[in-house]
Swiss-Prot record:
<dbReference type="GO" id="GO:0016020">
    <property type="term" value="C:membrane"/>
</dbReference>
<feature type="transmembrane region" description="Helical">
    <location>
        <begin position="80"/>
        <end position="100"/>
    </location>
</feature>
<keyword id="KW-0812">Transmembrane</keyword>
<keyword id="KW-0472">Membrane</keyword>
<feature type="transmembrane region" description="Helical">
    <location>
        <begin position="26"/>
        <end position="46"/>
    </location>
</feature>
<keyword id="KW-1043">Host membrane</keyword>
<keyword id="KW-1133">Transmembrane helix</keyword>
<protein>
    <recommendedName>
        <fullName>Putative transmembrane protein ORF112</fullName>
    </recommendedName>
</protein>
<feature type="transmembrane region" description="Helical">
    <location>
        <begin position="50"/>
        <end position="70"/>
    </location>
</feature>
<dbReference type="GO" id="GO:0033644">
    <property type="term" value="C:host cell membrane"/>
</dbReference>
């Protein structure tokens, strides 16, 4: 089975040949949905096993992708003051943002 999906501007350099997909990479999960759903019916049928397998991963993938987009400007600001932390800054910021959002939600909804 070969995937007939080609890269676009959204995911440059990501052609999925022989359906070798790292489902733990949220960017690739989002890309496979983007390509399959913008394509033809045949594109959806060819990638149906991948789409079904990654369906439970889609909400967390979208959540972490949005967190990543939100952390990019913060990373640029922190990079000015702490350039040595550049390789690990995005994971630190995402961890902090997720922790703060959970703390705020728990106060609003009284979760314990």
């Amino acid at each position: 089975m070969s995937c007939q999906i080609y890269p676009s501007q959204m995911c440059p350099g990501k052609a999925y040949k022989n359906c070798k997909l790292n489902i733990m990479n949220f960017w690739e999960v989002i890309c496979i949905y983007y390509f399959a759903l913008q394509g033809s019916f045949l594109g959806i049928l060819v990638n149906l096993p991948i789409l079904v397998t990654t369906l439970p991963l889609l909400p967390p993938a979208l959540f972490f992708y949005l967190m990543y987009l939100f952390a990019l400007p913060l990373k640029d600001i922190f990079n000015i003051f702490f350039p040595s932390l550049d390789p690990i800054l995005i994971p630190i910021l995402i961890f902090f943002l997720v922790g703060v959002s959970r703390a705020r939600l728990s106060k609003v909804f009284k979760w314990r």
